[in-house]
Amino acid sequence: MPATFDNLGITFQYPENWQLDEEEMRGGQIAVTVFSPGGAFWSVAVHPASADPARMAQAALDTMRKEYEGLEAEPINETIAGHELIGFNLNFFYLDLTNTAGIRSLRAEGTTYTIFFQAEDHEYGEIGLVFQAMTVSLLRDLGKKK
């Protein structure tokens, strides 16, 4: 049975055995991150509508490039639950393990959202489907709350 996060104007489902962390960032922006028992994580940051989704995705990519030498990034545009997302698929090494991550950003209902997810490649085949389900559950419910 999935757990449900329903706070801060967003709703999404996540596996009940994952750990959830809410944080307030600079400027009153918020982020919610959910961690798997194996260390994979999925995060959503909520920004003002004035934040440009393409710039948010690029800023996240720039931060990752500073952290991980040799990071490979592929631009991606996709539609999920009727929302247009822009971002990047990432591959990089960390502690001698290959990792896959994704950055997605969108503007909806007067707010800009940035979604970030990351897992080691050996678990990504399974965890990637969980990330996808969490993203769909978030985007499906955008605009339903006022």
Predicted feature locations:
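Short, surface-exposed beta-strand/loop "edge" segments at domain boundaries and coil↔beta transitions
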Residues: 39-44, 51-52, 96-99, 122-126
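Surface-exposed flexible segments
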Residues: 50-63, 125-137
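Secretory pathway targeting signatures of secreted, lumenal, and periplasmic proteins
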Residues: 2-58, 62
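Short beta-strand segments enriched in hydrophobic/aromatic residues
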Residues: 48, 92, 118-119
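Signature of long, low-cysteine stretches enriched in small and polar/charged residues
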Residues: 61-110, 132
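Hydrophobic residues embedded in beta-strands of well-ordered beta-sheets
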Residues: 30, 112-113
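Short secondary-structure junctions
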Residues: 4, 17-24, 65-79, 141
